[in-house]
């Protein structure tokens, strides 16, 4: 089904697009370590636009997985500051997308309608979303409609948070403030 066309994180079809973006030396790249990886979203979006124009033209929203999951659960299209900064080039410290970057790389159309396709509402991880689980999502998961759902976090960051409470091999628990 075309509406479920998924490009996973490790997909490297966008190497040429990443190289083209890196050649711009745009200031946005300073916030992703100086170069963009083909595993990040803007090269993938550019690849999609160039190689699957019908899919591109028909795309409603473009999501990273954690934001898709929260949207699917709540129908709230709010994006995570974590995923948008880490993988989409959102300037979190300025709370905005850089229009000149998207224009320079040929993706200015994703900023139409207040960037609704990629995230016009970006919030901190853990903030509540919408009215919680929709009836449909709640039924599918065996939960109660309205159960709270929060803004997402990418897996690597969630894994780090999950290990902070773990004890070492010795069983000794370090002071939490020293582990953070």
Task: Give the predicted meaning of each segment.
Residues 17-21:
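E2/UBC-UEV (E2-variant) core
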Residues 1, 6, 10-12, 23-154:
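Gly/Ser/Thr-rich active-site cleft segment
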Residues 139, 147, 151-180:
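Catalytic phosphate/nucleotide-handling subdomain of diverse soluble enzymes
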């Amino acid at each position: 089904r075309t509406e479920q066309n998924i490009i996973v994180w490790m997909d490297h079809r966008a190497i040429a697009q990443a190289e083209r973006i890196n050649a711009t030396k745009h200031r946005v790249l300073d916030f992703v370590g100086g170069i963009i990886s083909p595993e990040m979203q803007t090269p993938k979006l550019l690849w999609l636009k160039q190689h699957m124009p019908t899919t591109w033209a028909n795309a409603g929203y473009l999501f990273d997985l954690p934001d898709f999951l929260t949207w699917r659960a709540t129908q709230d299209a709010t994006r995570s500051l974590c995923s948008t900064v880490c993988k989409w080039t959102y300037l979190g410290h300025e709370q905005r997308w850089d229009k000149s970057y998207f224009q320079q790389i040929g993706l200015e159309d994703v900023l139409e309608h207040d960037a609704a396709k990629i995230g016009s509402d970006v919030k901190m991880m853990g903030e509540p979303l919408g009215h919680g689980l929709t009836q449909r999502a709640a039924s599918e998961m065996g939960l109660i409609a309205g159960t709270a759902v929060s803004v997402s976090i990418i897996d690597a960051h969630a894994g780090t948070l999950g290990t902070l409470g773990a004890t070492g091999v010795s069983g000794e628990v370090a002071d939490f403030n020293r582990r953070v």
